[in-house]
Amino acid sequence: MNFPETLERADSLPDVFEVVKLAAEQHVGRTRGGLMLALADLGNHPRGFLGAFYVIASNVIVMNKVPLVRIRDTQPHLYKHYAFHVLLHEYLHALGYVDEARCRQLVFDLSHTLFGEDHTATQIARDVTRFFPNLVYPDAAWQPADLKLELVANFDRGNTGYIA
Protein backbone atom coordinates (compact mmCIF):
# COMPACT_ATOMS: atom_id res chain seq x y z
CA MET A 1 0.00 0.00 0.00
CA ASN A 2 1.20 3.49 -0.81
CA PHE A 3 0.43 5.35 2.42
CA PRO A 4 1.23 8.88 1.16
CA GLU A 5 -1.21 8.46 -1.74
CA THR A 6 -3.85 6.84 0.45
CA LEU A 7 -3.68 9.70 2.98
CA GLU A 8 -3.80 12.26 0.19
CA ARG A 9 -7.03 10.67 -1.13
CA ALA A 10 -8.70 10.85 2.30
CA ASP A 11 -11.63 13.26 2.20
CA SER A 12 -12.87 13.13 5.79
CA LEU A 13 -11.86 12.24 9.33
CA PRO A 14 -13.28 8.71 8.91
CA ASP A 15 -11.15 8.35 5.76
CA VAL A 16 -8.05 9.51 7.63
CA PHE A 17 -8.87 7.08 10.45
CA GLU A 18 -8.99 4.19 7.97
CA VAL A 19 -5.40 5.09 7.00
CA VAL A 20 -4.48 5.27 10.70
CA LYS A 21 -5.86 1.79 11.36
CA LEU A 22 -4.07 0.26 8.38
CA ALA A 23 -0.82 1.96 9.34
CA ALA A 24 -1.00 0.79 12.96
CA GLU A 25 -1.88 -2.75 11.95
CA GLN A 26 1.05 -2.90 9.56
CA HIS A 27 3.54 -1.37 12.00
CA VAL A 28 2.55 -2.71 15.44
CA GLY A 29 0.43 -5.68 14.40
CA ARG A 30 -2.58 -4.67 16.49
CA THR A 31 -6.08 -3.47 15.68
CA ARG A 32 -9.05 -2.33 17.68
CA GLY A 33 -12.62 -2.05 16.50
CA GLY A 34 -15.69 -0.16 17.58
CA LEU A 35 -14.10 3.21 18.31
CA MET A 36 -16.04 6.44 18.12
CA LEU A 37 -14.77 9.94 17.44
CA ALA A 38 -16.32 12.85 19.27
CA LEU A 39 -15.51 16.46 18.49
CA ALA A 40 -15.58 18.95 21.33
CA ASP A 41 -14.35 22.40 22.25
CA LEU A 42 -11.67 21.40 24.74
CA GLY A 43 -10.69 24.95 25.53
CA ASN A 44 -7.11 25.53 26.57
CA HIS A 45 -4.79 23.43 28.66
CA PRO A 46 -2.49 25.40 31.00
CA ARG A 47 0.44 24.79 28.60
CA GLY A 48 -1.41 25.23 25.26
CA PHE A 49 -4.19 23.45 23.40
CA LEU A 50 -4.96 19.75 23.26
CA GLY A 51 -5.33 18.03 19.92
CA ALA A 52 -7.34 15.17 21.40
CA PHE A 53 -7.50 12.67 24.20
CA TYR A 54 -8.50 9.05 24.59
CA VAL A 55 -10.64 8.02 27.54
CA ILE A 56 -8.73 5.03 28.93
CA ALA A 57 -10.76 1.78 28.93
CA SER A 58 -13.43 3.27 26.67
CA ASN A 59 -14.19 3.37 22.97
CA VAL A 60 -14.10 7.16 22.53
CA ILE A 61 -11.45 9.43 21.09
CA VAL A 62 -12.29 13.07 21.78
CA MET A 63 -10.75 15.51 19.31
CA ASN A 64 -10.53 19.24 19.88
CA LYS A 65 -12.58 20.82 17.11
CA VAL A 66 -11.24 24.36 17.59
CA PRO A 67 -7.70 23.75 16.27
CA LEU A 68 -9.08 21.29 13.73
CA VAL A 69 -11.31 23.99 12.21
CA ARG A 70 -8.57 26.62 12.47
CA ILE A 71 -6.07 24.39 10.65
CA ARG A 72 -8.63 23.50 7.99
CA ASP A 73 -9.37 27.20 7.42
CA THR A 74 -5.85 28.67 7.66
CA GLN A 75 -3.48 25.83 6.70
CA PRO A 76 -5.56 23.38 4.64
CA HIS A 77 -2.42 21.71 3.27
CA LEU A 78 -1.68 20.50 6.84
CA TYR A 79 -5.21 19.37 7.76
CA LYS A 80 -4.95 15.67 6.81
CA HIS A 81 -1.44 15.38 8.22
CA TYR A 82 -2.51 16.97 11.51
CA ALA A 83 -5.59 14.73 11.71
CA PHE A 84 -3.48 11.66 10.92
CA HIS A 85 -0.94 12.57 13.60
CA VAL A 86 -3.51 13.23 16.32
CA LEU A 87 -5.74 10.26 15.47
CA LEU A 88 -2.77 7.89 15.27
CA HIS A 89 -1.52 9.06 18.66
CA GLU A 90 -4.91 8.48 20.27
CA TYR A 91 -5.47 5.19 18.42
CA LEU A 92 -2.18 3.90 19.82
CA HIS A 93 -3.47 4.80 23.29
CA ALA A 94 -6.61 2.78 22.48
CA LEU A 95 -4.35 -0.14 21.51
CA GLY A 96 -2.79 -0.07 24.97
CA TYR A 97 0.18 2.26 24.59
CA VAL A 98 -0.58 4.64 27.46
CA ASP A 99 2.92 5.98 28.15
CA GLU A 100 3.10 9.38 26.41
CA ALA A 101 6.79 9.25 25.50
CA ARG A 102 6.48 5.72 24.10
CA CYS A 103 3.35 6.67 22.17
CA ARG A 104 5.00 9.74 20.61
CA GLN A 105 8.02 7.66 19.62
CA LEU A 106 5.75 5.04 18.03
CA VAL A 107 3.93 7.74 16.06
CA PHE A 108 7.27 8.97 14.73
CA ASP A 109 8.60 5.48 13.96
CA LEU A 110 5.42 4.50 12.17
CA SER A 111 5.23 7.76 10.20
CA HIS A 112 8.90 7.55 9.21
CA THR A 113 8.60 3.93 8.08
CA LEU A 114 5.37 4.33 6.10
CA PHE A 115 5.72 7.87 4.74
CA GLY A 116 9.46 8.51 4.58
CA GLU A 117 11.67 11.18 6.12
CA ASP A 118 10.48 14.15 4.07
CA HIS A 119 6.72 13.59 4.28
CA THR A 120 4.75 16.16 6.26
CA ALA A 121 3.25 13.48 8.54
CA THR A 122 6.77 12.40 9.53
CA GLN A 123 7.92 15.98 10.05
CA ILE A 124 4.93 16.67 12.31
CA ALA A 125 5.69 13.48 14.26
CA ARG A 126 9.36 14.49 14.58
CA ASP A 127 8.59 17.97 15.94
CA VAL A 128 4.92 18.86 16.24
CA THR A 129 5.82 22.24 17.76
CA ARG A 130 7.43 23.30 14.48
CA PHE A 131 3.97 23.20 12.89
CA PHE A 132 1.69 23.71 15.89
CA PRO A 133 3.70 25.40 18.67
CA ASN A 134 0.87 25.39 21.21
CA LEU A 135 -0.13 21.71 20.94
CA VAL A 136 0.31 19.83 24.24
CA TYR A 137 -0.25 16.25 25.36
CA PRO A 138 -2.20 15.71 28.59
CA ASP A 139 -1.46 13.08 31.19
CA ALA A 140 -3.12 9.74 30.40
CA ALA A 141 -5.82 10.17 33.04
CA TRP A 142 -6.69 13.81 32.18
CA GLN A 143 -10.30 14.58 31.27
CA PRO A 144 -11.99 17.97 31.07
CA ALA A 145 -15.19 18.79 32.90
CA ASP A 146 -18.48 19.62 31.14
CA LEU A 147 -17.85 18.17 27.71
CA LYS A 148 -20.39 18.68 24.95
CA LEU A 149 -19.59 15.94 22.46
CA GLU A 150 -20.49 15.88 18.77
CA LEU A 151 -20.12 12.31 17.44
CA VAL A 152 -18.68 11.87 13.95
CA ALA A 153 -20.94 9.59 11.90
CA ASN A 154 -19.48 6.45 10.28
CA PHE A 155 -16.12 6.94 11.99
CA ASP A 156 -14.93 3.35 12.47
CA ARG A 157 -16.49 1.94 9.30
CA GLY A 158 -14.88 -1.46 9.30
CA ASN A 159 -16.24 -2.49 12.66
CA THR A 160 -19.91 -1.58 12.79
CA GLY A 161 -21.56 -4.51 11.04
CA TYR A 162 -22.86 -5.91 14.31
CA ILE A 163 -24.79 -2.76 15.26
CA ALA A 164 -28.47 -2.83 14.33
Language-model-detected regions and their locations in the chain:
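Active-site recognition of the HExxH zinc-binding catalytic motif
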Residues: 81-98, 104
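Short acidic, glycine/tyrosine-flanked loop/strand segments centered on an H-E-D-like triad
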Residues: 62-88
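Metalloprotease/metallohydrolase-associated module, dominated by Zn2+-dependent proteases
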Residues: 1-72, 98-164
